[in-house]
């Protein structure tokens, strides 16, 4: 197989692009590095295309390796023919390769094997030829043998039938046909193990839909219901059509004596061997596709969450709400440094409201707090009411935001949090995390396992390794899109930088602590175990503000410093002029990009990137994202009425819709059918996590705590 050609076709890119990307990946370059600094070679392939290419490259190479193993195994058995070898080499999927290998694959002891050991294969061949002019029983009598364990004529025929059934099952063409027809005409059906039992799976108690239309989130829901012993799930195939096909393929002559036996063999082969196997394969395939879709949605949601814009220059009060143990508060300055912590008890059972209000007023005055970040967990509603009442009394302009605290408790009990705040208890660490995730979501959320951040669906039911790798890739892409400040970034953030692992991240922090702030990117080469390759991969994503070389504060890669210097000189600028916030209009001064790029010895794409960076150094892509809604008043669910129009924040996007926070402690659901007037395949075509959207209330169910929203017809 020509892997490069296959990749180019699948991803709709040029062959030269696929070839260059594969070469760069094989040379050990990271996806963020290739996407940012090797655009010339790849024709500007972005990180998403490169990650898809990398994933498919691994699959196709694994496929080729498996083909080689299968060919070698069959050759060793001296059963390899040129036709079979060609079929294996031309196979496009692992399933197709395994189908071709099935007849030659070492098996556990089957009924057919036992029959062969009893010497019944010649009888199976006789039946298969369909030429006998006398009853098969007559020929079978010759195979009855006490020594071989064949006690009767019927036992001999049954053994021959078992051999024929396995031959039918091992036929790759038959399996392909049955797999395709089951996928296209089969029905996935579920029923309740106990119809009287109340559960979240009630809609699946008597449920069926065509296999080919089974939506990913429903497949995962059925799997979970089955695993929790609430549902029985099966695939109903068009059995009559399948048996008709098998009979047509295996019965070539209408022979009075062999036709009934062959029909029985075909039916047995399907019901005992092929059917259950194909059902397992299809269920596995549906699950894999559903997981793939869920991982993509999770990844997109995570990206939007990580790329929320930081809130700069404000002192934030982090508030971790609770009842019995009290609300933990942490004051964090504009750089993320913890100024103070305290525990207050305004909620039940202690209800020390006045004492708590006094502490809050003192904190707001003392630290000039202008923003309160409240976790959305237990006692969040009661905490919000206390804050709103307080804000009405004080003169200071203070706002608050309800923050998704998913993962805060996981982080606060982690080894990392213990190392960061050894003197704090779990609640204090959680309050700090809640404050910081509003100030700089990316820097804080990288400390938490992405699976704990709470923006996925069925994430605990899927392949954890696959999910973990995909989400790690998302975090890596986000960190490198934004870049990091080499002198303030934590080890948790640094480890996601291109070319940097956990060890190197810790070594960078250790070097910084021992030697003071980095003054130059070149100093990275003095960090233990950080060699030239790691430097090449990471340097462009590390920024130094106020360093020896102004270019170190940009995303211009050190390999392009010479070209950038010559460009500045050519246009009449000095490097130090960069420190003033960029050289506006520099890109317009370059009249002929092609000629200028040739003069500088770089590519035209690289020149445009350098010019853009000199114009606006280290621009933050998060600045273009929607900012969180800052509130100063409270809304109750009982206040909601159909027809009300509100502004809300998209908290989670799933296959069938999006959950929107409208400020009432219960996210409302905008079903996919209520998002736009035009047809969309997936909610992500209309919204993303973090989007600020206008919604209208459709209905409110106070008992079930459900809010239905629409985005249609909202002005």
Language model: regions and residue ranges:
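Short beta-alpha connecting loops at secondary-structure transitions
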Residues: 18, 341-348, 371, 413-426, ...
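Accessory alpha-helical DNA-binding modules that contact the DNA backbone or grooves
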Residues: 30-31, 46-113, 118-147, 481-624, ...
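Duplex nucleic acid-engaging cores and interfaces of nucleic-acid transaction enzymes
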Residues: 49-52, 59, 63, 68-318, ...
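Long, charge-rich intrinsically disordered scaffolds of nucleic-acid metabolism proteins
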Residues: 96, 401, 407, 412-482, ...
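Low-complexity, acidic/Ser/Thr- and charged residue-rich accessory regions of DNA metabolism proteins
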Residues: 139-153, 207-208, 245-251, 255-270, ...
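A glycine-rich phosphate-binding loop feature that marks nucleotide/adenosyl-phosphate handling sites
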Residues: 180-187, 319-323, 378-379, 403-410, ...
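Long, charged amphipathic helices and adjacent flexible linkers at domain junctions
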Residues: 281-299, 452-483, 598-642
């Amino acid at each position: 197989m020509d892997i490069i050609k296959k990749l180019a076709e699948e991803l709709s890119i040029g062959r030269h692009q696929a070839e260059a990307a594969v070469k760069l990946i094989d040379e050990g370059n990271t996806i963020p590095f290739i996407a940012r600094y090797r655009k010339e070679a790849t024709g500007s392939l972005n990180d998403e295309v490169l990650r898809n290419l990398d994933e498919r490259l691994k699959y196709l190479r694994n496929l080729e390796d498996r083909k080689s193993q299968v060919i070698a195994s069959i050759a060793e058995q001296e059963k390899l023919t040129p036709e079979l070898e060609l079929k294996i080499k031309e196979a496009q999927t692992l399933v197709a390769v395994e189908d071709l290998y099935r007849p030659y694959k070492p098996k556990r002891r089957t009924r057919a094997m036992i029959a062969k050991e009893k010497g019944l294969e010649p009888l199976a061949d006789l039946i298969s030829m369909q030429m006998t002019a006398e009853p098969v029983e007559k020929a079978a009598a010759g195979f009855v043998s006490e020594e071989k364990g064949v006690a009767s004529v019927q036992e001999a025929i049954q053994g021959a039938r078992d051999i024929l059934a396995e031959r039918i099952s091992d036929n790759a063409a038959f399996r392909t046909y049955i797999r395709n027809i089951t996928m296209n005409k089969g029905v996935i059906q579920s029923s309740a193990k106990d119809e009287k039992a109340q559960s979240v799976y009630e809609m699946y108690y008597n449920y069926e839909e065509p296999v080919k239309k089974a939506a990913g989130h429903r497949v995962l829901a059925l799997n979970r219901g089955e695993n929790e012993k609430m549902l029985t799930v099966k695939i109903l195939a068009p059995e009559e059509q399948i048996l008709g096909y098998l009979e047509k393929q295996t019965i070539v002559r209408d022979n009075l004596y062999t036709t009934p036996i062959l029909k029985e063999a075909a039916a047995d082969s399907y019901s005992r061997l092929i059917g259950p196997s194909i059902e397992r394969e299809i269920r596995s395939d549906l699950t894999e596709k559903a997981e793939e879709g869920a991982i993509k949605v999770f990844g997109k949601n995570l990206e939007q969450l990580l790329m929320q814009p930081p809130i700069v220059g404000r002192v934030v009060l982090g508030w971790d709400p609770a009842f019995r143990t009290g609300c933990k508060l942490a004051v964090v300055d504009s750089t993320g440094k913890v100024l103070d912590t305290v525990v207050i008890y305004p909620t039940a059972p202690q209800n020390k409201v006045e004492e708590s209000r006094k502490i809050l007023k003192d904190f707001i005055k003392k630290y000039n707090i202008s923003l309160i970040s409240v976790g959305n967990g237990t006692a969040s509603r009661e905490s919000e009411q206390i804050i709103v009442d307080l804000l009405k009394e004080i003169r200071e302009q203070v706002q608050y935001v309800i923050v998704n605290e998913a993962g805060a408790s996981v982080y606060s009990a982690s080894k990392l949090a213990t190392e960061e705040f050894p003197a704090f208890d779990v609640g204090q660490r959680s309050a700090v995390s809640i404050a910081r995730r509003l100030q700089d979501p990316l820097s804080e959320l990288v400390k938490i396992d992405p699976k704990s951040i709470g923006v996925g669906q069925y994430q605990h039911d899927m392949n954890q390794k696959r999910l973990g790798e995909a989400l790690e890739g998302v975090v890596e892409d986000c960190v490198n899109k934004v870049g990091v400040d080499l002198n303030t970034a934590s080890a948790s953030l640094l480890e996601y930088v291109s070319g940097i692992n956990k060890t190197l991240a810790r070594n960078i922090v250790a070097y910084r602590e021992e030697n003071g702030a980095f003054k130059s990117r070149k100093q990275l080469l003095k960090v233990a175990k950080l060699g030239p390759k790691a430097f090449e991969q990471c340097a462009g994503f590390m920024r130094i503000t106020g360093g020896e070389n102004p270019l170190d504060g940009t995303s211009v890669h050190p390999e392009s410093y010479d070209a950038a210097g010559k460009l500045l000189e050519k246009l009449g600028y000095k490097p130090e002029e960069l420190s003033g916030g960029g050289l506006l209009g520099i890109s317009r001064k370059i009249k002929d990009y092609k000629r200028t790029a040739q003069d500088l010895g770089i590519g035209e794409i690289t020149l445009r990137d350098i010019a853009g960076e000199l114009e606006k150094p280290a621009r933050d892509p998060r600045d273009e994202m929607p900012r969180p809604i800052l509130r100063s008043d409270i809304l109750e669910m009982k206040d909601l009425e159909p027809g009300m129009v509100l502004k809300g924040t998209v908290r989670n996007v799933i296959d069938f819709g999006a959950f929107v926070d409208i400020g009432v402690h219960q996210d409302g659901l905008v079903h996919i059918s209520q998002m736009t007037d035009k047809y969309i395949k997936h909610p992500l075509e209309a919204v993303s996590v973090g989007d600020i959207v206008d919604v209208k209330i459709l209905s409110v169910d106070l008992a079930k705590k459900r809010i239905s929203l629409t985005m249609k017809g909202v002005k």
